[in-house]
C-alpha cells in the first residue's frame, strides 16, 4: 500500500518562488523512500501579505510514511536555512488600556 505525505512550508514574500520550488523538489527527490510515480509535487499554493506558502506532496510505501514525513520536514527546514531563505516576518501588535498608551505601570 502507498501513502502520500503532504507538507506545508512558508517563506518571506520577497523570495523568488521558482528558487524555493526547485530547492523543495531537489530535497524531496534526494530521499530514496520517495516514489518516482506518482511524481512528487512542490508548488507555490498560496500568497499572503507577508508570506509565500508552498505545498510538498510525496508518495511512499505505507511502512515508510512517518519516518519520511518527519525526515522531509527536518531536511527541508535545514535546506531553507542553509540557503538563507527567511521565514515570514512576524508582526506583533499590542493594545493598551484606554488612556494608558505608551506608558507602563
Regions found by a protein language model. Give the residues of each.
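Short glycine-/aliphatic-rich beta-strand segments at the starts of folded cytosolic domains
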Residues: 1-13
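Solvent-exposed, non-transmembrane regulatory segments of membrane-associated proteins
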Residues: 11-15, 21, 25, 29, ...
Amino acid at each position: 500500500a502507498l501513502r502520500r505525505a503532504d507538507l506545508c512550508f512558508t517563506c518571506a514574500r520577497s523570495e523568488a518562488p521558482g528558487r524555493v520550488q526547485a530547492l523543495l523538489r531537489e530535497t524531496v527527490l534526494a530521499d530514496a523512500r520517495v516514489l518516482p510515480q506518482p511524481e512528487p509535487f512542490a508548488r507555490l499554493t498560496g500568497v499572503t501579505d507577508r508570506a509565500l506558502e508552498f505545498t510538498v506532496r510525496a508518495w511512499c510505501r505505507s511502512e515508510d510514511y512517518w519516518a519520511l514525513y518527519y525526515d522531509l520536514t527536518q531536511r527541508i527546514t535545514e535546506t531553507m536555512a542553509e540557503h538563507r531563505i527567511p521565514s515570514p516576518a512576524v508582526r506583533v501588535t499590542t493594545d493598551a488600556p484606554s488612556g494608558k498608551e505608551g506608558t507602563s505601570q
